[in-house]
């Protein structure tokens, strides 16, 4: 479903430089919501390699993990093999735009950095977002939760020290990520009531690897952030040349620190939580 990344290839390296940012927010939301449910069934829509599913599995009764890419799904199955034996989790190959589930069968649906992959970024209408969220509304029980974990425009500009090195990709990403106000309006139009917007200020997508100033020189490091897939080869080469120049001059560490300074105020991701009316 992704319009810009080959996840069959990326799945081989994804978990080397990627962690589930904001897990504590997700766990808290699900734990509070399940208090009113004797059994709690969660859909991980666009589960990728299963990082978020692994994190929240102890807090729900059952997870259905779905992804359109067989490579990502294979990694998730391997990662969660022990849980599968206890029937806590089931895996499905399918699209978030047409979910292979009956209506009103889930207590929560989570989209973790998925919806931007449904857009070309050219018309500004975000039909991919709307289609997926409408499907979430369909498969949720009354009062069920949808959690959208995505990147805001200010976070794109200031939350990643290296993105300014690939301006074409940064611009393309900006057009694919829905503005917060538009997302909240869309949720309301689709029959959801917004319950909150949360930003994990200390979360890092790449964990400790984020501070590897020479990371952009390595393809496997870049595979942990699909934004690099939107950069033309010439732009990647230019970014690599800049990193090497700074390394040679001894200025690479200060350069990273300078361009990372605002991340502590804006974070790298935003969680939107809404309830089906």
Where do the PLM segments sit?
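C-terminal helical/coil "lid" or tail adjacent to the Rossmann-like core of SAM-dependent
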Residues: 203-256
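A short acidic, Gly/Pro-enriched loop at the edge of an enzyme's catalytic core
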Residues: 97-109
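A short SAM/SAH-binding and catalytic strip from SAM-dependent methyltransferases
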Residues: 108-127
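Conserved class I S-adenosyl-L-methionine
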Residues: 1-40, 51, 72-75, 82-84, 145-174
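Short alpha-helix
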Residues: 175-191
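Class I SAM-dependent methyltransferase SAM/SAH-binding core
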Residues: 43, 49-98, 131
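A short glycine-rich, Lys/Arg-flanked "PGG" loop and its adjoining helix->strand segment in the class I
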Residues: 127-142
């Amino acid at each position: 479903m992704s319009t810009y990344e080959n996840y069959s290839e990326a799945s081989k390296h994804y978990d080397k430089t990627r962690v589930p940012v904001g897990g504590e927010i997700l766990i808290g939301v699900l734990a509070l919501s399940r208090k009113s449910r004797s059994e709690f069934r969660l859909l991980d829509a666009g589960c990728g390699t299963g990082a978020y599913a692994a994190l929240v599995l102890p807090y729900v009764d059952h997870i259905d993990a779905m992804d359109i890419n067989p490579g990502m799904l294979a990694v998730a199955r391997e990662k969660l093999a022990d849980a599968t034996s206890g029937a806590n989790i089931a895996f499905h190959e399918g699209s978030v735009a047409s979910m292979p589930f009956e209506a009103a069968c889930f207590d929560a649906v989570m989209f973790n950095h998925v919806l931007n992959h449904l857009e070309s970024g050219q018309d500004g209408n975000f039909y991919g977002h709307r289609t997926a969220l409408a499907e979430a509304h369909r498969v949720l029980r009354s009062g069920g939760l949808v959690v959208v974990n995505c990147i805001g425009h200010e976070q794109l500009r200031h939350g990643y020290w290296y993105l300014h090195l690939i301006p074409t990709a940064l611009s393309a990403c900006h057009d694919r990520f829905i503005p917060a106000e538009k997302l909240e309006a869309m949720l309301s139009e689709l029959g959801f009531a917004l319950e909150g917007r949360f930003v994990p200020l200390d979360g890092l997508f790449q964990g400790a690897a984020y501070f590897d100033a020479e990371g952009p020189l390595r393809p496997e490091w870049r595979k942990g952030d699909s934004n690099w897939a939107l950069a033309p080869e010439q732009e990647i080469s230019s970014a690599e040349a800049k990193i090497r120049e700074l390394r040679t001059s001894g200025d690479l560490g200060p350069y990273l620190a300078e361009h990372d300074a605002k991340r502590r105020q804006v974070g790298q991701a935003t969680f939107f939580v809404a309830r089906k009316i």
